[in-house]
Every structure is written in structure tokens, then in C-alpha cells.
Amino acid sequence: QRQAAKYGRRESEIDYGTNPCSEIILRPKQFCNLSEVVVRADDTAESLQDKIELATILGTIQSCFTDFKGLGRQWSKNTEEERLLGVSLTGILDNAMLANKTKDSLPALLGSLRTGAVNVNRKWATMLNIEPSAAITCVKPSGTVSQLVDAASGIHPRHSEYYIRTVRADKKDPLTLFMT
């Protein structure tokens, strides 16, 4: 509850939980709406802000899709009330500017990027005639996406040329049956 109320945009009295990966604080019967920004080695503060702007626009538009056929009304109600975004960065330690920031300068840069995302969300929410999002940015591990785009995972450095990954599949899935 304390973390959810940190920026004053979410109700502090709700008994929040998380999504399965525990990076997003959710009400009961609520969805994530994640958008990932891939940080490249040559990104600057300006290019990151541009990428975050696009991810925030995408997430804000996606937050309008709230007609969930087959689910109870509470799912739509929670989604419409909070319009959560989850704009995150992956590959942070592939970028010298971010990796070499000090404990004082990195929070300032990340705070500036977050403020930019909040401002973009407010602008687009006004244009779309919806309420601004209650939460906009997140930090998440991003293991799968980082592999697909050849980036360090989330906020973590690259440790090895090879990784062991756990993959779960339904035992009735044709691919699982083929591999076993």
C-alpha cells in the first residue's frame, strides 16, 4: 500500500497484490499493460526520452481497450479507473551513460525520464478524453524480451555468454509432446 501510494496517484486503502512476476502492483481483478524500451549502447538521454515518449503513447492508447468480453465488470472498472502503464527500460547496463552514473546522478536521470513519461501520459490522456494513468513506469527483469533483442536483462549486467532458462509448457501442448 505504501509503494502504491508513493506518488499520490493511487488509492492507499486498497489491498494490492502483484502480477505473476511481482513487478507491477495490481488491484484484485486487474491487468498489466507493459511497454518495453530497449536501451542501446549509443542511446543518449534525449534518445531514451524519445523512446519512452513513444512507449508511453502506445501504453496510453492501449489503456483505452477495456471491453473484456467474458470477464466480470470489475476487471473493466479497475482497468478504466487506473489505466496502468508499465513503461520500463531493458539493457540499462549495455549503455555506458547509464552504467557509469553515480548513486546521485542516476536517480536524477531516471527521475527526469519518469517525469517525461508522466507528462506525455497526461497530454495524451487529455487528447483521448480519459483520466491519466495511476502508475506509468516500472522496473522489471525482462529476461525473455532481452534475449529477443540482444540486450542485457532489465537492470542486470551480462554475466555469461550462455544462460540456463526454465521454460514451462502445458504437458498436452503438441510442442511439449514432441520434445519429451
Label for each model-derived stretch:
Residues 2-99, 167:
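Function-dense linear segments that define catalytic or interfacial modules
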Residues 148-149:
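Short linear motifs in exposed loops
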Residues 36-41, 138-140, 152:
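Short, flexible loop/turn elements at secondary-structure junctions
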Residues 27-30, 54, 85, 113-117, ...:
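Active-site-proximal structural scaffolding
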Residues 152-180:
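Catalytic or ion-translocation cores adjacent to nucleophile or general acid/base/metal-coordination motifs
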Residues 66-76, 91, 96-141:
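Internal maturation/activation junctions in enzymes
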